[in-house]
């Protein structure tokens, strides 16, 4: 059962006060705090927001931290010794905040090395999961917890995953992830690439929106809508 907004805010204030006087006998439960803070965030930001899946890298010097290995980090813009975390954020016109997180464990260097996992404090039952699989676990969990999102967004890593799309379709949840330009879709009964669909959109049907500040200034994107895959059995995709 979800707490009321006032009850959550009162509990949040009590947790904040308790944080000023640490209890040495208390057990840290990151998931419980995530759930409590998540409820507080949604109460403050309001319903009908967007769930956003994305990953970020944490550059490391050593090799002992859980999940660390040489891999591409978007944060660094190159291959680095780093950890990768997959995050779920919630955004509305009132603001944005993180709701959940999962640590990505590279298959061959972590789940396949139980001694290394034990040394880093990784639970023995943890199995390998792709980044989209981590997202597929987080999004339904947030919705089941009562997050009243209207749609889900993410980059191409997540947009190309059929399981994540299937889960969202089953829940009749709108989604606008990035996909590869060569992805095949059905347009008026003809199979074409996503890039070809974009070429059919005239300038007058494109709407430019700013997506925050980038390293080289404001990031502007042109948006348009096209009806694709209309023959899906449930008419929803």
Predicted regions mapped to residue ranges:
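Conserved, well-structured functional cores that handle cations and Mg-NTP chemistry
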Residues: 1-152, 157-174, 191
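An anionic, glycine-rich sequence signature occurring as long contiguous blocks
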Residues: 77, 96-120, 124, 128, ...
